[in-house]
Amino acid sequence: MADIQSRVDELHRLLNQYSYEYYVKDNPSVPDSEYDKLLHELIDIETQHPEYRTADSPTVRVGGSAQSTFEKVNHDTPMLSLGNAFNEEDLRKFDQRIRDNIGNVEYMCELKIDGLAVSLKYENGRFVQGLTRGDGTTGEDITENLKTIHAIPLKINESRTFEVRGEAYMPRKSFVNLNEAKAANEEQPFANPRNAAAGSLRQLDSKLAAKRKLSVFLYSVNDFTQFNADTQSEALDELDQLGFKTNQERQRVQTIEEVMTYIDKWTKQRENLPYDIDGIVIKVNALEQQETLGFTQKSPRWAIAYKFPAEEVVTELLDIELSIGRTGVVTPTAVLEPVRVAGTTVSRASLHNEDLIHDKDIRIGDSVVIKKAGDIIPEVIKSVLDRRPDDAEIYHMPSHCPSCEHELVRIEGEVALRCINPKCQAQLVEGLIHFVSRQAMNIDGLGTKIIQQLYENEKIKDVADIFYLTKEDLLPLDRMGEKKVDNLLNAIEKAKSNSLEQLLFGLGIRHLGVKASQVIAEKYGTIDELFHVTEEALMDIHDVGHKLAQSVVTYLENEDIRALIDKLKAKNVNMIYKGVKTTELEGHPDFKDKTIVLTGKLYQMTRNEASNWLALQGAKVTNSVTKNTDLVIAGEDAGSKLAKAEKFGTEIWSEEAFVQKQNEIEG
């Protein structure tokens, strides 16, 4: 048996070495056939002797058993997006702001890889968890799929615990091979490598993900306490030394002129790369200066992403159709002859409003120039006048709503036409779609087509009806089998424990966006407190103006809305902000004013349910264990947070002890 163990160890060493040489250094020392031979030898040993298979065995690269779903996991620290720059003027403003704050600065310029942002967690040198970015606060656990990417080390040679972040992507060669295989099987090809990478990492069967030949570039460290770096460039160098793959085209520069030179170089050379990039990232290099500059709610102040100019193409405008939004705004949409733009086929594009159509003299039948705003949303820029046909048709907006026939109005100071019928079906359906969206209640599986069917079948008339749905309501719907229905009902049940700000945003109160929902929920803590708020009190909150304050108060004073809230409460939908200030709640003395961390897998409730219950007791629930943490509630496989709590001497409870205390309090 000792001979088997030594051979397994040797195979691990050789396979990890060859994988690193091929996928990270791009300099293989042996042919593929040698790697395959050794891998199959290890697979045979593990098949005959399962006790020799480890979590970090090179054989996990080929994928394992299929999962039923991806678990949602909170990030230890948010994965923020970057602010955007679209031209030299934007970059010079960024540079001036930086220098006004911290004086002289060195920048690190890096290629912006066009893929899927991921977070990789290592404990004692072993890769233990990988998450998608998700909404920045909560991502999906795609660990098994990420293990199939050879550029991600399953373990490193040092016993460190840390988190790194980067971009998973599909090399152009892999993309071509994948689409050729899809074409041969008469399957729909992927539009671009980014979509292919995202689709591959969301495969429930990791064996399928393994076949897609993805790669990754790491670009940041989440916590520098385990690193010796003082700068971004030193951090990337240290990641190189640990065996991670970082992009080697990075460059340190001293001036904004050097930044522009770097951008110009890669604007011209981007098509020569073996992977797609969609811009350049500019970061303040010194970590101390990064800390001084800090963050906004959405992004770091010390970094910016320059986006390459959008590709423009010409196609024919076939027709103009109207869509009705959840607030009644009527938006004209161009129906186009399908055309490829920035890697995807576009057949529809926004025309924004009637004034834009007339100001730009855009007519049905014209050849029009379209581009993707921010490389995402297609829009019509202008008509090509010298190609205009004689029968090009001037477009006139209708006087009545195409959904409910109610008269359309233009509110003073607005350019959009609006349907003000509160019973307009199109608005109601759009409101339901908004309620379940990712930044609102985030109900997986409840898409547009299902909502439309449920509305047409009179199973849902308002957002509260969603929480009253049964298996009998869902099974008759198109393409809804037993498993899909169970998953959807579980997602609906899970949404009940969402935080107050998600509910507020989901209700679709006019002028109330994600950020304002967060700020207002944090300020008032519960929906019942908001029922008593005045416009003046709301306007005391930073960034809340008169229009928003008036809209919120008017909405919550409506008796129909109060009845809707009661209907939601009857189904135990949470009405409390997850981080509600303990001073505003009576709470329970065992938890009031205490800082508590939940870690590991809970079986008798979800993390959100536990967090909301603790908030009701006056506790502050956080993600990180520090010396100031009062209590850690540890479920199964608690990991590094439990170890840190033991190190600090923090009080630790099991899930069973926590549930027992809940039962005592609730009688």
Curated annotation (Swiss-Prot):
Enzyme category, top tier: ligase
Binding positions for NAD(+) per the UniProt entry: D32, S33, E34, Y35, D36, S81, L82, E110, R133, E167, K283, K307
Keyword flag Secreted: no
Cited PROSITE patterns: BRCT, DNA_LIGASE_N1, DNA_LIGASE_N2
Any GO BP annotation: DNA repair
Source organism: Staphylococcus saprophyticus subsp. saprophyticus (strain ATCC 15305 / DSM 20229 / NCIMB 8711 / NCTC 7292 / S-41)
Family recorded in the similarity comment: Belongs to the NAD-dependent DNA ligase family. LigA subfamily.
This enzyme's EC code(s): 6.5.1.2
UniProt cofactor(s): Mg(2+); Mn(2+)
Protein name, entry field: DNA ligase
UniProt keyword list: DNA damage, DNA repair, DNA replication, Ligase, Magnesium, Manganese, Metal-binding, NAD, Zinc
Active-site positions on this chain: K112
Catalyzed chemical reaction(s): NAD(+) + (deoxyribonucleotide)n-3'-hydroxyl + 5'-phospho-(deoxyribonucleotide)m = (deoxyribonucleotide)n+m + AMP + beta-nicotinamide D-nucleotide
Gene Ontology terms, MF aspect: DNA binding; DNA ligase (NAD+) activity; metal ion binding
Sequence positions that bind Zn(2+): C401, C404, C419, C424
Function, as annotated: DNA ligase that catalyzes the formation of phosphodiester linkages between 5'-phosphoryl and 3'-hydroxyl groups in double-stranded DNA using NAD as a coenzyme and as the energy source for the reaction. It is essential for DNA replication and repair of damaged DNA.
HAMAP family: DNA_ligase_A (MF_01588)
InterPro entries tied to this protein: BRCT_dom (IPR001357), BRCT_dom_sf (IPR036420), DisA/LigA_HHH (IPR041663), DNA_ligase (IPR001679), DNA_ligase_AS (IPR018239), DNA_ligase_CS (IPR033136), DNAligase_adenylation (IPR013839), DNAligase_N (IPR013840)
Annotated ranges, domain BRCT: 586-667
GO annotation, cellular component aspect: cytosol
Domain of life, source organism: Bacteria
